[in-house]
Design a protein with these regions (language model features):
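Metal-dependent amide/peptide-bond hydrolase catalytic core
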Residues: 2-247
């Protein structure tokens, strides 16, 4: 599946009394412009009319000549703002700093350096260039022993061919145990429940991320994900797994 990284954008401003905001330089207003650019980066197309080429561009061999085929399978990268922070002397003062966290999902052909430079090149970031810092988060949380092993918050994209030996081994084991038919849901409405009519095992990709981005993506140890349910339920409110997906 796709890789991921965690990006931080910091913006500096100058505080002043809220009764005369023109004396200061509001960091939140600067960040507002950057937020719109990041939204455009995620949502825009890659046509000539787009000043900011959207992340969908990596599905196009023109922008991703080596890895476009794998990117088309995995799906385009995405970015979303997940956190926002600010500092201000009080509720009656201009904010002198603002920061955001960006959750960046990466398709084939994208690297951490590529993603950082992509943010740095945004028009609003260039506009406020001297007051903006774009960086990658680091994991530095102590382990249960107290040891701190600082690691970049970057985990590479990884992909296996369906013909890979370890993929076929799992598929063969699944067929030997349960056959190729979906358990239950034979009367499912294909308009709303097409996945339940597909034979199993279904060999595909995931949109979300798992520890395999570290095991295979970072360390090159062959991996395969296996599980029940629908990925649309992951981290969803009232997350469920259908009884038909469980062996009882």
């Amino acid at each position: 599946h796709r890789g991921r990284m965690e990006i931080r954008v910091d913006v500096k401003g100058i505080s002043c009394h809220g009764s005369a905001p023109e004396r200061g330089d509001n960091a939140i207003y600067k960040m507002a412009d950057i937020l719109q650019n990041i939204r455009s980066l995620n949502e825009n197309g890659d046509g000539p009319s787009n000043e900011i080429k959207g992340l969908v561009k990596m599905l196009n061999p023109e922008f991703n000549p080596v890895h476009a085929e794998d990117a088309q399978f995995l799906g385009r990268g995405t970015c979303t703002v997940s956190q926002i922070f600010y500092t201000s002397p009080s509720r009656c003062a201009v904010a002198d700093s603002c920061a955001i966290s960006v959750d960046r999902r990466m398709t084939a052909g994208e690297t951490w350096d590529f993603c950082l430079k992509e943010i740095e090149a945004l028009p609003a970031v260039q506009k406020y260039k001297d007051d903006v810092k774009v960086s990658m988060y680091m994991y530095d949380r102590p382990s249960w022993t107290g040891e701190v092993y600082e690691t970049e918050c970057f985990f590479p994209t990884w992909i296996n061919k369906e013909s890979a030996a370890h993929v076929q081994a799992l598929a063969d084991a699944h067929k030997a145990l349960w056959g190729e038919a979906r358990i239950g849901h034979a009367d499912a409405d294909p308009k709303y429940d097409a996945m339940h009519l597909r034979n199993r095992p279904l060999i595909d990709k995931w949109t979300f991320s798992t520890n395999c981005v570290s095991i295979q993506g970072r360390y090159g140890i062959p991996c395969v994900g296996f599980g029940t349910g629908a990925e649309s339920q992951a981290h969803a409110p009232n997350e469920i797994t259908w009884k038909q997906d469980l062996l009882t």
